[in-house]
Amino acid sequence: MKNYLYILCAFLLAFAGCTKDADVEPIAPAPDGNTQVVLTGFSGRGTRTGFGGAEDGAVPFLWSAGDYIWARNTRSEAIAEGGSQATFVFESLETADTYDVFYNLTGPAAATALIPAEQTQQAAGELNLGQNGDFGYATAQNGTFTLEHATSYVWFDTYSSDVTSNLLSITLSVSGGQTIAGEAAFADGKLGDCKGSSSVTLSFGEEGVALPSQSNDTDVFAAMVLYPADLSTATVSIVYKFADGSVYLQTKSGKTLTPGHTLRLSTPVSYTHLTLPTTPY
């Protein structure tokens, strides 16, 4: 079964990150009398740790190799392969009819999300949502579950027909100092107040990535994880930095970021609109 998260095509947002580093808590020692527990996560409206190719204006989200989940403050083994379905093994866990399940690779505790200020992506189309703060939750019954997600996402559909320099990073900042990424505790089906910053940078490594020559409705060029916030009264600044030192700046009206939803930002970049580095004399 394949599921799709429908893209809200809105021009956009801004997002921010948290400057705080936090270690993921270690796997909790299991008390005597526990048994091996296996929970299976299926494709669903919110299930994802990476984007698949878009079809008919929708993007499927899939499990990725290395993913793990939490149940009763205990971490599962990481999965070896991704896909629309994944089986998570807990070597020793208290048996129960239901389990509260969390997908969280970055937070300091199972039910605390941490969306970092510095996010990374190593290549075009190779998204890193889990390590960039993606946070999911579910109730497992009869050994199965389907994730819902408390974080939001932006799909960068950035392209150019004449910019040849590689893109090094994208930085989004929001006016008014609103916190749009950082650390937030999960309770009552949503993330609570977020403690973090009002900007976030998605970096593409030292060499950067080449921009595609045209917009693409099926391949996701880049994506970022965001804290869901009402940015409808904010102004968003988006800075694209290139390997030759040039910069492209956008300013847009903010939008409301909805948990579990993706906002697409289609941006044509023209060489004539770049701010070029100053040549010293």
Descriptions of predicted regions:
Residues 273-281:
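Single conserved hydrophobic/aromatic residue that forms the stacking wall/gate
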Residues 7-14:
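Bacterial N-terminal signal peptides
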Residues 2-5, 18-274:
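Sec-type signal peptide cleavage vicinity
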